[in-house]
């Protein structure tokens, strides 16, 4: 029987914080050092867009804690209006975070530019990007069906506004905040449910918490002084390693220096409620973010996961694919509601999960905002083809199931894991052992 044991010190740096650190550095006056920047394709796309829009970006490898090699990024800027007109469309590849959040910055620059991406990104909805920026005074043009390319005619005369987000979205909240930094006056962003709050934490923005909403206050045209950033390990990447340990009985794994921001690590509480053998140790605060070690000691398995609370869904939206596959394989059951946002990710993740789980013999039923796994009616004989839909989280979720259970799965376009987890397979090999 295959089990997984060891100490993980090479988990990818947090993708969300890496994006934001680079963008905030480009808006700051002076030189910013970002330690432990992500090597994932998405974060490298952000650096590429910054370079091609005139920002000085340097990247090098340095020795860090636990003897690991990490990336240090150094970004030099003169402040809010340091960008220059690009000579070609800005390529975001597969990174929706890059395309959406950079739109907010570029809408405030006095030139025209275009943001493009790969085939998957060019299908994703961008109207939610255009609407607030148009209200602030930028000219934004999309394709007829509301997708990229995003053509931006920016202006230094952006207006502040009060904007209520129609759905919880950390990317849309952040792009408005980045645009608002350039505007005259004070902007207020109202979110009905809390989304990940890295932008507020990193910029030190005031947040007003009311009964049914949160208000983020962004003062306009404030000087941002360069400051260093340290990027902790990505909790979304940690979820895959946790699932690996929980699916393979007898596994013992420690994951070091993981971001435990409550808006990112809520899935840990969910798993604890399901009687999963996990714990947290060595908690501390670095750069405003809670960081700690996650311990996995799997002796008893877990109970089925049923997810419906809208706030919880907003917090764990990226981890749902892995949690669904984990619950299905470990218990034969899973239930999800209020997660329609999953249909607008790198793939329609509800459809992708249901299609692949059905191929593996699970009885599933999907709804507009979720799906249910009722039971496993058969275990297919021989190798089963899994369709990744060119989505890194779908590919990794089923790869974890294959590694932990020994089932033979042939996953299409498996190289897509490099979007967020370049050392995914090498890390699994390091942890693998025979019981």
Swiss-Prot record:
Class of this enzyme: transferase
One Pfam family, short name: EPSP_synthase
Residue numbers binding 3-phosphoshikimate: 15-16, 20, 169, 171, 195, 318, 345
InterPro entries: Enolpyruvate_Tfrase_dom, Enolpyruvate_Tfrase_sf, EPSP_synthase, EPSP_synthase_CS, RNA3'P_cycl/enolpyr_Trfase_a/b
Signal sequence segment: none
Annotated phosphoenolpyruvate binding sites: 15, 96, 124, 171, 349, 393
Catalytic reactions on record: 3-phosphoshikimate + phosphoenolpyruvate = 5-O-(1-carboxyvinyl)-3-phosphoshikimate + phosphate
Swiss-Prot/TrEMBL GO biological process terms: amino acid biosynthetic process; aromatic amino acid family biosynthetic process; chorismate biosynthetic process
Keywords recorded for this protein, A-Z: Amino-acid biosynthesis, Aromatic amino acid biosynthesis, Cytoplasm, Transferase
Cell location: Cytoplasm
Primary site of residence: cytoplasm
Molecular functions per Gene Ontology: 3-phosphoshikimate 1-carboxyvinyltransferase activity
Pathway: Metabolic intermediate biosynthesis; chorismate biosynthesis; chorismate from D-erythrose 4-phosphate and phosphoenolpyruvate: step 6/7
Gene Ontology terms: cellular component: cytoplasm
Coiled-coil portions: none
Enzyme Commission code: 2.5.1.19
Active-site residues (renumbered): 318
SUPFAM superfamilies: EPT/RTPC-like (SSF55205)
Similarity comment: family membership: Belongs to the EPSP synthase family.
Role description: Catalyzes the transfer of the enolpyruvyl moiety of phosphoenolpyruvate (PEP) to the 5-hydroxyl of shikimate-3-phosphate (S3P) to produce enolpyruvyl shikimate-3-phosphate and inorganic phosphate.
Subunit relationships: Monomer.
Name of the protein in its database record: 3-phosphoshikimate 1-carboxyvinyltransferase
Species of the source: Chlorobium chlorochromatii (strain CaD3)
């Amino acid at each position: 029987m295959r089990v997984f044991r060891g100490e993980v010190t090479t988990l990818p740096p947090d993708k969300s914080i890496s994006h934001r650190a680079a963008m905030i550095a480009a808006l700051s006056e002076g030189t910013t050092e970002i330690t432990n920047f992500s090597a994932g394709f998405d974060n490298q796309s952000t650096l590429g867009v910054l370079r091609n829009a005139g920002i000085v970006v340097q990247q090098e490898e340095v020795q860090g804690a636990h003897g690991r090699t990490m990336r240090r990024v150094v970004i030099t800027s003169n402040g809010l209006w340091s960008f220059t007109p690009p000579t070609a469309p800005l390529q975001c590849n597969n990174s929706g975070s890059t395309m959406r959040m950079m739109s907010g910055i570029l809408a405030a620059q006095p030139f025209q530019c275009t943001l493009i991406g790969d085939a998957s990104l060019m299908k994703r909805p961008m109207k939610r990007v255009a609407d607030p920026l148009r209200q602030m005074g930028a000219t934004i043009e999309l394709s007829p069906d509301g997708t990229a390319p995003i053509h931006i005619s920016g202006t230094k005369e952006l207006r502040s506004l009060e904007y209520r987000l129609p759905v919880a979205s950390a990317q849309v909240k952040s792009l408005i905040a980045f645009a608002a930094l350039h505007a005259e006056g004070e902007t207020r962003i109202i979110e009905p449910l809390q989304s990940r709050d890295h932008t507020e934490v990193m910029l030190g923005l005031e947040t007003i918490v009311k009964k049914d909403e949160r208000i983020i206050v962004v003062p306009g045209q404030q000087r941002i002084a360069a400051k260093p950033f340290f990027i902790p390990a990505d909790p979304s990447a940690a979820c895959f390693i946790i699932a690996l340990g929980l699916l393979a009985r007898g596994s013992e794994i420690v994951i070091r220096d993981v971001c435990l921001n409550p808006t990112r690590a809520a899935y840990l509480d969910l798993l604890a409620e399901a009687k999963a053998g996990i714990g947290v140790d060595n908690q501390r605060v670095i750069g405003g973010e809670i960081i700690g070690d996650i311990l996995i000691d799997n002796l008893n398995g877990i109970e089925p996961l049923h997810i419906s609370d809208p706030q919880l869904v907003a917090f764990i939206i990226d981890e749902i694919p892995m949690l669904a596959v984990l619950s299905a394989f470990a218990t034969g059951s899973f239930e999800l509601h209020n997660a329609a946002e999953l249909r607008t990710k790198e793939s329609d993740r509800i459809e992708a999960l249901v299609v692949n789980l059905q191929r593996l013999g699970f009885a599933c039923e999907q709804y507009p905002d979720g799906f249910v796994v009722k039971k496993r009616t058969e275990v297919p004989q021989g190798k089963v083809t899994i369709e990744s839909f060119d989505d890194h989280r779908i590919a990794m979720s089923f790869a974890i199931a294959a590694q932990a259970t020994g089932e033979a799965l042939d996953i299409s376009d498996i190289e897509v894991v490099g979007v967020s987890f370049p050392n995914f397979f090498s890390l699994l090999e390091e942890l693998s052992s025979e019981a």
